[in-house]
């Protein structure tokens, strides 16, 4: 009887082991197929990566082929976890950047900030650019860009405000600020702002970086630190590059506000800076 029990136990043990080995084998096959088809690739080991473990990931160039014009190789760069910030390289094509600028140019006005008590726009010396809003879903190209933003962020398109196009000339800037609200008035429509997608529509010869002065990291460890302006060296900074998009979160994963998301636009020293911002809310944003 004891022998029979032992035999059954051994049979069950071998059966479980074979099942586990089979599952591991199938998982390996699936991963190899995903790699072969370019759905994802292994992290690239870059000798120039900094001690903060900047990570680089490749997207298949064919994964997001819709839109105006042809985009270059798309890849994602992890900048920081405090705040959560990522750069999507070649997020927009050159033609899409130029299209947004051409739509906005005839309607540019002096940029304002939101009054926390009334919710109305007001002039402020902390923001010296010019800008305009493009209504959400106003045409096919805008819809395509907004859908792309939704696909990358997993935030529905109807949670976003209209695209804001901004223009900074030499000397113009935006002092460090938060995109989230600290009042109840501005959260009535859509709730709190949870994330921002900042798309660069032009290159900038010098200056104009997006800077995070409260980021929890060693600012000087990034490979491009020596290329930054004095303003850019005061925090974690991203240099404007046509077609790139910077995504950062104003809220932590536990839904609390993230003070490390403090950010600003450094003064443009040489050239012009064009950008487009999409603010995304916790709930549906009605327009």
Swiss-Prot record:
The keyword RNA-binding does not apply. InterPro entries: Oxoglu/Fe-dep_dioxygenase_dom, P4HA-like, Pro_4_hyd_alph, Pro_4_hyd_alph_FE2OG_OXY. Fe cation binds at residues 177, 179, 263. Residues 38-287 are lumenal. It catalyses: L-prolyl-[collagen] + 2-oxoglutarate + O2 = trans-4-hydroxy-L-prolyl-[collagen] + succinate + CO2. Signal peptide: none annotated. Gene3D superfamilies: q2cbj1_9rhob like domain. This is Probable prolyl 4-hydroxylase 3. It comes from Arabidopsis thaliana.
């Amino acid at each position: 009887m004891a022998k029979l029990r032992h035999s059954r136990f051994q049979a069950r043990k071998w059966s479980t082991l074979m099942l586990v080995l089979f599952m591991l084998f199938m998982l390996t096959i699936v991963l190899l197929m995903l790699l072969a088809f370019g759905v994802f690739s292994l992290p690239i080991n870059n000798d120039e990566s900094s001690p903060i473990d900047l990570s680089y990931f490749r997207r298949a160039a064919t994964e997001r082929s819709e839109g105006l014009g042809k985009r270059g190789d798309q890849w994602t760069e992890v900048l920081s976890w405090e705040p959560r910030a990522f750069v999507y390289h070649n997020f927009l094509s050159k033609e899409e950047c130029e299209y947004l600028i051409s739509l906005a140019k005839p309607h540019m006005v002096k940029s304002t900030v939101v009054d926390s008590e009334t919710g109305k726009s007001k002039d402020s010396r902390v923001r010296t650019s010019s800008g305009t809003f493009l209504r959400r879903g106003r045409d096919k190209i805008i819809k395509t860009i907004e859908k792309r933003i939704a696909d990358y962020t997993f935030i529905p398109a109807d949670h976003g405000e209209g695209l804001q196009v901004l223009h900074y000339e030499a000397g113009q800037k935006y002092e460090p600020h938060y995109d989230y609200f600290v009042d109840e008035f501005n959260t009535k429509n859509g709730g709190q702002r949870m994330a921002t997608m900042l798309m660069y529509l032009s290159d900038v010869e010098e200056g104009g970086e997006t800077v995070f002065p409260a980021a929890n990291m060693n600012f000087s460890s990034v490979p491009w630190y020596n290329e930054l302006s004095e303003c850019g060296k005061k925090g974690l900074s991203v240099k404007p590059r046509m077609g790139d998009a910077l995504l950062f979160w104003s809220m932590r994963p536990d839904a609390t506000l993230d003070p490390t998301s403090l950010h600003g636009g450094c003064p443009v020293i040489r050239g012009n800076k064009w950008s487009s911002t999409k603010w995304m809310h916790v709930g549906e944003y009605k327009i």
